[in-house]
Every structure is written in C-alpha cells, then in structure tokens.
C-alpha cells in the first residue's frame, strides 16, 4: 500500500463522490498512520488541524502545528505529517484538483495568479495559525465548504467552487509573494527519489538503482539524501516499509508473512525484529492493539 493507495482507501471509506474532484477526509495520527511519509502529488491539499499537536513538513521545512492551524500544500510540494512527542492529532485532509477552476479560455484570474501559483513562480504562506493575518477569512471559506458537504444539496459543487475562488482571491490579494525562495532543482531531485521509493518499495531496491534515477553517483546520492532527509537512505527505506506494514496490519486480514513480503522484506525474522524495534511491539501485538 503506497500513499496513493492509502488515500484511495480513505476515499472509499468516506464515500467520496469521484465525479467532483474535491475530497474531504478525516484523519488521525497515529490511528490511521503513525506518520505520513514525505510524498507529493498533483492535487492541492489543505491540512486543517482539529485538535492535538503534530508536525507538518512542507518542502523540507518543519512546522509544529496544533488545533485550528491550517496548512496549505500546493501541487507538487513535498510534505509529510508526524507525531509530536507521542501525542495524537486529528485533522481534516482536503484534496482537490485546481484544474477544475481554470477556464478553457485563459483570463487574468488564471494567467496572473492561478497558473503562476501552480508553476511555483509565486508563493503563498504554507501555514496559517489563529493569529495569522487573514486567518478568519481563510478558515471561513473552508468551514463553509465543510458545512455544505454534510448534506450535499443540489448545486453544492457550484457553491464549493465559488468558495474556492474566494479562498484564492484572499491568497492573491493579501498573501502572495512574487519571488519563490524554493531550491527547485534540489526539490525536483528529491521528488524523483521519493516517487521511486513509493513505486518500488515492495521490491528489492539498491542504492545504485535509486542514484541512477537522478543521475547521481552512489556516494553523492547517499550524501545528498542524508543532508536533506536527516537520515540515511537505508534507514529511511526501512522506516517507510514499516509504516506501510503498520497500515496493512490494521486494514487487511493478510498474514504477517504476506504483509512482510508485500512491503519489501524477504525475511520474516528480519521484519519481526525491525518492527518490534521501531514500534516496541511485535506485528501480532500491534494488530491486536489497533483492532
């Protein structure tokens, strides 16, 4: 199960209408995942913290967040969600395709803001706390969308689109930055690496293969990964596999051996040992505790 498969699972559980690309998911750390590993996708994401405390990382910058905080994830931005000091955090995950707001015939709303925002030519703040300027206006747009999604009356999709335009108006009129401080080249390399892991973690992966995917030597790749991720590639891959295994233990009836093989471990003893070292319990105990 990779990140995309997990999101699809959540969507099915939440009975999302696939015909309208605006998905609202209620999530919990660590109930759904002990962490959401660093990843990216083409949709925009809003992480709306409901209660608790945690960390959200956006393009390598980590933010400590708590109840009522709003985090904006632009299409293509690297992001992850983690626990803070073993505390739980409940949050709303809103994922939507910005393309549904783009006109077929270009106008100034798309050429002056939406497309430059999507391409990274301009930026907006990633995090809005209750004391941030314009927080109330931004949260009001999201709250209004949440409220109408409870009943979904005829035309609710038009209402949501209207609120999204209002949301982007606030960002464009009051929160935009013309210069993009992101180190795009470094981020693009890491996006390739993370997508490679997400696609291939269930198979044997060598450092040579991943280094080749970004045209690095093995030594340069290992140094680059450690500098940007704060851990070695081998340790990161092991933790990623264990995170996916923990979710499968909860949502599937597969045997522990099958799960170990599905997430890339070719030896059950090694899997059990690594899992207990990371989570403090065996896979069987973990499944019982979370059932």
Where in the sequence are the language-model features?
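Terminal helix-turn-helix DNA-binding modules in bacterial transcription factors
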Residues: 191-199, 204-217, 223-272, 288-291
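Short acidic-glycine-tyrosine-enriched beta hairpin
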Residues: 60-75
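Short, Lys/Arg-enriched, Trp-marked, Pro/Gly-tolerant hinge/linker segments that flank
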Residues: 124-135, 149-203, 207-214, 227-239
């Amino acid at each position: 199960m990779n990140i995309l498969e997990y999101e699809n699972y959540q969507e099915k559980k939440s009975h999302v209408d696939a015909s309208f690309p605006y998905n609202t998911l209620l999530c919990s750390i660590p109930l759904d995942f002990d962490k959401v590993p660093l990843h990216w996708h083409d949709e925009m994401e809003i992480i709306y913290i409901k209660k608790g405390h945690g960390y959200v990382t956006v393009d390598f910058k980590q933010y400590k967040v708590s109840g009522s905080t709003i985090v904006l994830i632009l299409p293509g931005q690297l992001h992850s969600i983690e626990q803070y000091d073993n505390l739980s955090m409940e949050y709303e995950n809103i994922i939507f395709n910005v393309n549904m707001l783009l006109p077929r015939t270009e106008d100034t709303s798309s050429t002056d803001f939406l497309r430059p925002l999507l391409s990274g030519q301009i930026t907006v703040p990633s995090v809005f706390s209750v004391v941030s300027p314009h927080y109330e206006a931004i949260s009001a747009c999201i709250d209004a969308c949440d409220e109408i999604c409870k009943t979904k009356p005829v035309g609710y999709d038009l209402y949501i689109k209207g609120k999204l335009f209002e949301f982007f108006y606030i960002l464009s009129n009051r929160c935009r930055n013309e210069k993009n401080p992101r180190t795009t080249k470094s981020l693009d390399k890491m996006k390739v690496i993370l997508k490679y892991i997400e696609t291939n973690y269930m198979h044997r992966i060598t450092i040579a293969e991943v280094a080749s995917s970004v045209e690095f030597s093995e030594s340069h790749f290992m140094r680059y990964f450690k500098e940007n991720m704060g851990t070695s590639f081998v340790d990161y891959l092991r933790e990623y596999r264990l995170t996916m295994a923990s979710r499968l233990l909860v949502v599937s009836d597969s045997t522990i051996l099958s799960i170990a093989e599905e997430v890339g471990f070719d030896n059950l003893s090694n899997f059990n040992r690594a899992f207990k070292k990371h989570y403090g319990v065996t896979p069987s105990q973990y499944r019982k505790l979370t059932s």
